[in-house]
């Protein structure tokens, strides 16, 4: 044979996803993967990973930047905010009142870094220091006030369909149900509830927290999520930049699979080849 598999050139098709944009509060993004800035071993790793991910939204913990917490000194200046949209978050806030104050600081921080029209805030109200599970009541209270103040609120919540709908009704720009506890790497443990949220939401659904590897990112997107926010799985990987690239590819793959529509799950096999003309089968009578 002149042509063998070993000699053949294989090309991986790169899908054109430019028309499939993510829109949040009237602003459009090409990438459906958001990343964070925490837990990296160095700023160099962080910058390389964010670049490899192709993300356009990066979340920043306002309190840690404001207080120059260890590992966050100079963080605000470490990235090119002309190319990346900042998503200030209220991590570290245990009450609605704290989260509202920190959200206001985050908006001012974004303005100082050149994003004058940035009203985005990732809302986190977490009084639980062990499991880092969000407070649904405090989150709703803070969201109501921040929406009144003109914020585009992206609330981090348990995968609670009723809470997600209530937050949508008060004017939140997205809902962000957790896949499993923050940093746990347990993957998607709330699949049924996330499906319900996706089916009923009229705002983007962003799965946030718990994703540990690329297959779980693809799984979340296959459920119909509009986007993902992934930090620990990238930052704490042995090779963060490579994991960031894997997560980016998985996000695209999962999105395409959701749009394509998977086959139904059946209890019995269905042959993919014709059942006529089998060896040993009698010819049809003419």
UniProtKB/Swiss-Prot annotation:
UniProt protein name: Thiazole synthase
Reaction(s) this enzyme catalyzes, per UniProt: [ThiS sulfur-carrier protein]-C-terminal-Gly-aminoethanethioate + 2-iminoacetate + 1-deoxy-D-xylulose 5-phosphate = [ThiS sulfur-carrier protein]-C-terminal Gly-Gly + 2-[(2R,5Z)-2-carboxy-4-methylthiazol-5(2H)-ylidene]ethyl phosphate + 2 H2O + H(+)
Record's keyword terms, sorted: Cytoplasm, Schiff base, Thiamine biosynthesis, Transferase
Pathway connected to this protein: Cofactor biosynthesis; thiamine diphosphate biosynthesis
InterPro entries: Aldolase_TIM, Thiazole_synthase_ThiG, ThiG
GO molecular function, one term: thiazole synthase activity
Family that this chain belongs to: Belongs to the ThiG family.
């Amino acid at each position: 044979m002149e042509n063998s598999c070993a000699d053949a050139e294989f090309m991986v098709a790169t899908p054109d996803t430019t028309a499939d944009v993510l829109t949040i509060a009237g602003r459009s993004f090409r990438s459906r993967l958001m990343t964070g800035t925490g837990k990296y071993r160095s700023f160099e790793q962080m910058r390389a990973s964010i670049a490899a991910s192709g993300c356009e939204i990066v979340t920043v913990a306002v309190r840690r930047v404001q207080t120059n917490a260890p590992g966050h000194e100079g963080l605000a200046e470490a990235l090119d905010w002309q190319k990346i949209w900042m998503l200030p978050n209220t991590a570290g806030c245990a009450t609605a009142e704290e989260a509202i104050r920190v959200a206001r600081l985050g908006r001012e921080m974004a303005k100082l870094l050149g994003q004058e029209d940035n009203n985005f805030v990732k809302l986190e109200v977490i009084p639980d220091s062990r499991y880092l599970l969000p407070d649904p009541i405090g989150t709703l209270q803070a969201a109501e006030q921040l929406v009144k103040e003109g914020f585009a609120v992206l609330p981090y919540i348990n995968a609670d369909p009723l809470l997600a709908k209530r937050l949508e009704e008060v004017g939140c720009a997205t809902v962000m149900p957790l896949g499993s506890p923050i940093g746990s790497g347990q993957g998607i443990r709330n699949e049924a509830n996330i499906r319900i949220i996706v089916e009923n939401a009229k705002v983007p659904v962003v799965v946030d927290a718990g994703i540990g590897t690329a297959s779980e990112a693809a799984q979340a997107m296959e459920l119909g999520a509009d986007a993902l926010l992934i930090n620990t799985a990238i930052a704490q990987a042995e090779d963060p930049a490579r994991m960031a690239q894997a997560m980016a590819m998985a996000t695209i793959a999962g999105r395409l699979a959701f749009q394509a529509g998977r086959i139904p799950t059946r209890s019995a096999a269905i042959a993919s080849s014709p059942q006529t003309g089998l060896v040993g089968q009698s010819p049809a009578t003419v």
